[in-house]
Amino acid sequence: MKPILPDYNNAGVLIIGDVMLDRYWYGPTSRISPEAPVPVVKVENNEERPGGAANVAMNIASLGGHARIVGLTGMDEPAKVLTETLNSLKVKCDFVALPEYPTITKLRVMSRGQQLIRLDFEDKFEGTDPELVLTRMERALPHVQAVILSDYAKGALEHVEALIAKARAANVPVFIDPKGTNFEPYRGATLLTPNMSEFEAVVGKVTSDDDLVEKALGLIEKFELGALLVTRSEHGMTLVRPDQKPFHLPTQAKEVYDVTGAGDTVISVLAASVAAGKPLDEACALANAAAGVVVGKLGTSTLSTIELAEAIHGSRDTDFGVIAEAALIDAVKAAQAKGEKVVMTNGCFDILHAGHVSYLNNAAKLGDRLIVAVNTDESVKRLKGPGRPVNPTDRRMAVLAGLGAVDWVVPFSEDTPQRLISEVLPDLLVKGGDYKPEDIAGGKEVIAAGGEVKVLNFEDGCSTTEIIDAIKGGRG
């Protein structure tokens, strides 16, 4: 499966869970301490990153989604750092500040790419009033299409059953990264994402893929779950749902430097993709690709839609296919950053014929990437009149995406693609027919940005209208 990136700008996700601050101290190590047999690190720089549930929120924001987060913090300097950092990324924070507790903070000392020690500053949040979190959840639910409960067993999800019930009552799917060996509190969740160690701690040793599926189905039935996604390290991940075939996904990681936060990335991409309208199997494929990216980074990491697109589609010779506008803009920027020339054209392409294919092949030869923008059904009807289009938008785009000359296919609903072109800003805008370059929609914007506009001739004797008339007349 090669999934297509959704438009994450349409995804609203609420994250509730254990928030923490990850601190990193970096420096070289050149000697052993005379006080004890430990290395001496000369700290030269430091870094602070949101961790735990806050890293989940940061992942969603980095994809372009709308993240809201609820969690428990102290009233201290780490809480301030967390809030300011997340706000700068456009994450809406609604933390419960409890002065009697410290904000959970983890300090890692790093040298030469290796973690030497981790120091944890925390007290488990216990006995907090559940209404503090529930009321914040109620405020957020009307604005989201998915809920993530990120459980690190630090106390924020002490009343997880009530959170699941409230989300289900609002008909919002609940995705949970579980903790511990007791899954009873997660009863009724839409999906759990245990890693293999967490899964085996609950069901016992797994001996084969079939055994994993059988045990996963047992958990699904026992705890009334919608599905289980078991992340399996070098073996990828497996999605198990009742009454459906298991969906095995091989790992996409080329190199593994650090698994810190990989589970956060999986659940964030998964939930954001579902919130943006993707079916669960495609969302899992996207999450698997995302995990392959972040384990190749050091420390708690996020990824962009550009990195995710490249992980999915691989080399420049691989067609991207149908793509959402926001993802296309990111993909074009990535292509241009690598020195690739991006060509763009547009049309209705109602009944694809030899003239279209010849035109698109010629357009593709003018650069490294070809974008085809396609009028939606409503747009075609306004331009061509009643009875058009013959083929709906999704079919027209699917046919175009299957052509070797075409890299991306994107729909637009306006009468002209001027707005879309001004957002994408290709290096070369191409149009077929007898237009003057200055009259082509979007041409002025492309030229102003340093690009070019070119007119190509259509092949004589090929016309969609003629084909339709011939069919109506009973010929051919």
From Swiss-Prot:
Record: active site: D264
Q: Which Pfam families match?
A: CTP_transf_like, PfkB
Which species is this UniProt entry from?
A: Vibrio vulnificus (strain CMCP6)
Oligomer and partners: Homodimer.
- CDD domains reported for this sequence: RfaE_like
Task: Report the top EC class in one word.
Answer: transferase
Q: In which pathway does it act?
A: Nucleotide-sugar biosynthesis; ADP-L-glycero-beta-D-manno-heptose biosynthesis; ADP-L-glycero-beta-D-manno-heptose from D-glycero-beta-D-manno-heptose 7-phosphate: step 1/4; Nucleotide-sugar biosynthesis; ADP-L-glycero-beta-D-manno-heptose biosynthesis; ADP-L-glycero-beta-D-manno-heptose from D-glycero-beta-D-manno-heptose 7-phosphate: step 3/4; Bacterial outer membrane biogenesis; LPS core biosynthesis
Region (Cytidylyltransferase) residue ranges read 344-476
Q: What is this protein called?
A: Bifunctional protein HldE
Residues covered by region (Ribokinase): 1-318
Question: What does the record give as the function of this protein?
Answer: Catalyzes the ADP transfer from ATP to D-glycero-beta-D-manno-heptose 1-phosphate, yielding ADP-D-glycero-beta-D-manno-heptose.
